[in-house]
Amino acid sequence: LTALVLASPGFAGAVELTLEGEAVSRGYGAMSFDIAARCGSPNRMTEPLSLVPWPVEVPEVVDIPPELSLFPLAILLEIIHDDLRLNTTLPTYDPLMLIAIDAIDRADGGEVDLSDASDLVTPAAAWLALTSGGTLTGIAHARGKESDRIAGTIEMLATFGLEAQESPDGMVIEGGQSLHRPIEPIETHMDHRLAMTAMVLASKVGGVIVGAEISEVTHPGFVKQLLALGTNQ
């Protein structure tokens, strides 16, 4: 949907869309329409949805918000490094993402719906495995991300000795688990979320990450920043 909204200036005419199923990642959808509106788009999220072409008006100032979905990685670093405290602040542009982060923190073995925050799947699974455990739901669509993010997360966690079981729309994670150094190189399937979470875990126990450079897609300089924290591995 985001791609269609941003491509709509080049449409030859109006395009009628029919949306099926339950809405997911609603915060990103709303942001897409907002960005387009700031550039002159008349299109709005309505039902039925019609996207019309429009002339682009480039704003003089473009404010790019911080990547909120990276915050769980900071939490994960603090969980595995007892003496590490990071100076982080949470931007508030996506309330649905904030609700999801809070739900992970409060899981206590319960259910966490990540339907509006599927980018949190991998760090959330590691977070729950090392703390109270829980069940991640609402993320069947994560199988169509840069990788099958459910299967990829389970595979990656297993290399660190962390267990998770796949479910129809997510995964079940037992809490109170412990990290172990991977024996084999860690495959990330060129998925930046898998790579960054794997690097955070490896900062505690070590490991060889395949395709670590893909993290630049989301966070340029991530590897340098992680090394600058002075962790032992």
Regions found by a protein language model. Name each.
Residues L1-Q233:
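Short, structured segments at the rim of ligand-binding sites
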